[in-house]
Amino acid sequence: EVNPRSSRTVPFLSKATGYSMADIATKCILGESLKDQGISIICPKEKDRWYVKVPAFSFSKLNDLDAYLSPEMKSTGEAIGYDKKLTRAIYKALIASGMNVANYGTILVSIADKDKEEALPLIRRFYQLGFNIEATEGTAKFLRSHNIKTRIKQKLSSGSTEILTSIRQGHVNYVISTRDVDIASQQTDGYKIRRCAVENNVTMFTALDTVK
C-alpha cells in the first residue's frame, strides 16, 4: 500500500473546489497536462464560502477504549460543513459528525493539574454564557478561587456514582476531561467519566485546543 498522506485531504479539496483532483492527477500521470485538460493551475476563489472538515470517531463501538485523544490517535472518518460564514460552517460540520451542540445547559469539568491555568479562560467563557459548571473537587476548588460558581461533584473513587448518574440521565450537555499524561489506568475517575459520556452520546472534549 502506498499512502501519500492525502487520502482524506484530496477528497475534501475536490468537494470544496469542484475539481476531481484524482481524475486530474491520473490524466497528468498519463501525460495529459493541466493545460490540455483546460484547467488553470490556480483554482478560482469562491466568494463568501467557507468549507470546514472535522474528525469523526467510533469510540462508542469500541468497548473499554479510553476516549482520550493521544497524539497517535486517528479519526475513523470526517464530516464537511460549508456556509457563507465560518462559524456556521464549523457548526454544520460538528452536527454532521454526530456531535450534539447546545447553547445552554450544564458542563462537567475534570481537568488535570497541568491544564488548569489554560482551561480557566475557557471555562469562564462558558460560565459567562450562562452554562452551569460542575466539577470534581480539585477542579471545582480551583474554579471557585477564580470567582466561577461551580457545583462540586463527588469523585467516583470515593464511592459516589452521582457523576455517572447525572450523565446517564441527560443532565450534562458537555464533558471537558483532560488527564495527566502518565496516568492511563482504566480505574481512574477520568476514564470512567469519558466512557460514560461516549456511551450516552454526550459531547466530550479531551483537548483544550478543541474547546477553543
Language-model features and meaning:
Residues E1-N103:
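ATP-dependent carboxylate activation and anion-phosphoryl transfer catalytic cores
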Residues R5, A112-K114, R179-I183:
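Short glycine-rich anion-binding loops that position phosphate/pyrophosphate groups of nucleotides
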Residues L86-K92, I111-D115, N132-A135, Q154-L164:
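A general structural motif
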Residues I95-I107, F126-Y127, S166-V172:
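Glycine-rich phosphate/diphosphate-binding loops that line cofactor/substrate pockets in enzymes
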Residues E118, R124-R125, G138-K141:
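Phosphate-binding active sites in nucleotide-utilizing proteins
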Residues G130-F142:
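Short internal beta-strands
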Residues Q154-K155, S160-K212:
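Peripheral docking tails and interdomain loops at the edges
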